[in-house]
Amino acid sequence: MIYTVSFNPSLDYVQDLDCVNLGYVNRTSGEKILPGGKGINVSMVLKNLGFENQALGFTAGFTGEVLKSMLRAKGVESDFIELDAGMTRINVKIRAKEETEINGQGPKISADALELLYQKLETLQEGDILVLAGSIPESMPQSAYMDIMKRLQDKKLKIVVDATRDLLVNVLPYKPFMIKPNNFELGEIFGVEIKDKDDVCKYARKLQEQGARNVLVSMAGDGAVLLAEDGSEYRAEAPKGTVKNSVGAGDSMVAGFIAGYLITDGGADAYRNAFEMGVCTGSASAFSEELATKEEVEGLYVKTFGKK
């Protein structure tokens, strides 16, 4: 089974405008509300690709109920811990000539609530996949990802971590199955400018040396790189298409990687297939108004790699 964790999920209020004039009344040309959060995005894309999974984390208030209802409508199973106070945050995504995001803080998460989540995670079984994605709210210890991996290190799970800076570096001693920094985040970790795929490979290898089993690095329009635990190195240019929405592309890449790996059941071509699926799923979401569908991913896969 696949599980995703979202400490601070959201409802994303997406507004389309021709332009934004600060200090004046602005009227939208369209709007919609979508489930949001990196772990939530991974769950929804996995479901779109045909992989059952369960979204875990925290919700609160009426917005939390709306979030759970929207996930049910999309066929995504969830088992959130309901907080006693506050409300699940609403993030505003403004799509005009430039994209602007206004993200809410979200509810406070108590130590008792966090312990309930830890106990839930301790019921996972050998071979399960756990995705830890996104930032950690200020009300929680910033060691939460590391604490989870430490508590689960003997359970033989495949844990995927999509986080930045210390949140990512601190989990490396616990040998995450896969990590997915982008090229800018990779440069931030080492205090360098990443200029090309050779640089990506150089510094991604350092993350492997620190414990990461597989390092997948997204490079937006410049493609992606995977350093696999079997010593293989994969590079790809970005698929061709018109970018309509950058939100969720990285999360979609994570979902695609997991799906591609599971399709081959860890066989000889598992990492190649995982990489190619990740690249195509991330791009398919970027080329779509919402998150990628299975049909969009399959079409882009054939177009990019010449096979299904």
Label the predicted regions.
Residues R27-M87:
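Substrate-binding N-lobe of the ribokinase-like
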Residues S143-D230:
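Conserved phosphate/ATP/ADP-binding segment of small-molecule kinases
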Residues E101-N103, D128-G134, D162, K180-E185:
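Short beta-strands and strand-loop turn motifs
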Residues M44-E52, R95, G260-D265:
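Alpha-helix C-terminal capping segments
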Residues M1-G23, K32:
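Positively charged, low-complexity intrinsically disordered leader regions
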Residues L83, K93-E126:
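Conserved phosphate-binding/catalytic loop of the ribokinase/pfkB sugar-kinase fold
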Residues K197-K308:
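Conserved phosphate-binding/catalytic region of the ribokinase-like
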Residues I90-I94, A224-L227:
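Short beta-strand scaffold segments in enzyme catalytic cores
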